[in-house]
Amino acid sequence: PPYHIIYMKIKEGFTLRDVCGEKVIIAEGLRNLNFSKLINLNESAAYIWNSLQEKEEFTDETIADLLCQEYEVDHATALADAQKLLAEWQEQGLVD
């Protein structure tokens, strides 16, 4: 089947914080009262999260491009990593 581009955006109400040297995403406000855990991010995921805050929407290609610009990684590897990260963020309810 043809490859379909899926546009996503980060849900409102989540903030990246530095907690005791760890990068974590936390839920803020009443909307997310049932959010019972912190989501840890490694350095590259935190870089991506911060970079995506400025974008209205993004795709796995957007993330792959960010990874290629910031780190010495080939596009195919970056795209695979981007797709894995987006799948995790979808599962955790961080992106639409």
Task: Name every feature range the model reports, one short phrase each.
Residues 3-6, 37-96:
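Long, charge-rich, low-complexity alpha-helical segments
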Residues 2-47:
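Acidic, low-complexity/disordered tracts enriched in E/D and polar residues
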